[in-house]
Amino acid sequence: MTHIPVLLKEMLLQLSPHSGGIYVDATFGAGGYSKAILESADCKVYAVDRDETVTKFYDDLNVKYPNRIKLFIEKFSNIKNLLDSNNIKGINGIVFDVGVSSMQLDNGDRGFSFLRDGPLNMSMDNYSHMNASTFVNALREEEIANTIYNYGGERHSRRIARAIVNARKKKIIKTTFELADIVRSVVFRGKSKIDPATRTFQAIRIWVNDELGELEKGIKAASEILSENGKLIVVTFHSLEDRIVKTVFKDLCEPGSTKTFSLLNKKVIKASSEEINVNPRARSAKLRAIQRLS
């Protein structure tokens, strides 16, 4: 599956890149946003990603746009320290496209997808001491149930947690297919088009990568390094992420905050029906944007 950037036109419209501008793509991935920004104006892009496998996409862009893009392999929660330590200032815009990428899902060895057999990993950076195997084989039943419920919205979380614990008593759960089969054995699809393992895999991935904590830290750090009139744009894919962005943006726009921001759009921006037809992944995407006033 080719990774198609979601809400690309809408992101560019909000960002409005200009010649001489300096922009940060905090979630480089396959480079879709970075490429679009570089194409739209004679500007510079600093790209950030915790997954070192993205360097192949960066190399392609660096050849096409020499001296205009630089990649850092780092978590975006460290974005302020990263840019400060490299003396990068005058940031005109920062974009986030959060969540797992198609290339991560498509690689069975990364262990993100129940559609491809592979080791239980799900780590976005491959350096984490915690992975999906740790989650299913080491955590207490109550912790497993609460995480699957809170991060996956799975109402059968306790049933799933009990099944996982019973299965690991017999042998270590090693692969994505093994885990998916355990979940499916106690949660039945019925008429739903959604695979019973979907919410459980989402919850484990969020736990492994501390995605919600990273997101909150990342956008707060990004807000501190924007120049006056700089824009901060975040695209999310599920309600937990969007709630964090909405809350942080609301706090930043409150009168009396250290740096004053304003919402670029009062209502959240969603994908058009045309985009959803081409890229079904866009259905759940939401874009929020703010601008620093002072």
Swiss-Prot record:
GO terms for cellular component: cytoplasm. It is an enzyme of class 2 (transferase). It catalyses: cytidine(1402) in 16S rRNA + S-adenosyl-L-methionine = N(4)-methylcytidine(1402) in 16S rRNA + S-adenosyl-L-homocysteine + H(+). The keyword Endoplasmic reticulum does not apply. One of its GO terms (biological process) is rRNA base methylation. It comes from the Bacteria. Its EC number is 2.1.1.199. S-adenosyl-L-methionine binds at G31, G32, Y33, D49, F76, D97, Q104. InterPro entries: RsmH, SAM-dep_MeTrfase_MraW_recog, SAM-dependent_MTases_sf. SUPFAM superfamilies: Putative methyltransferase TM0872, insert domain, S-adenosyl-L-methionine-dependent methyltransferases. Keywords: Cytoplasm, Methyltransferase, rRNA processing, S-adenosyl-L-methionine, Transferase. The keyword rRNA processing applies. GO terms for molecular function: rRNA (cytosine-N4-)-methyltransferase activity. Pfam families: Methyltransf_5. PANTHER family: 12S RRNA N4-METHYLCYTIDINE METHYLTRANSFERASE, S-ADENOSYL-METHYLTRANSFERASE MRAW. Specifically methylates the N4 position of cytidine in position 1402 (C1402) of 16S rRNA. Belongs to the methyltransferase superfamily. RsmH family. This is Ribosomal RNA small subunit methyltransferase H. The lineage of its organism: Bacteria, Pseudomonadati, Pseudomonadota, Alphaproteobacteria, Rickettsiales. The gene is rsmH.
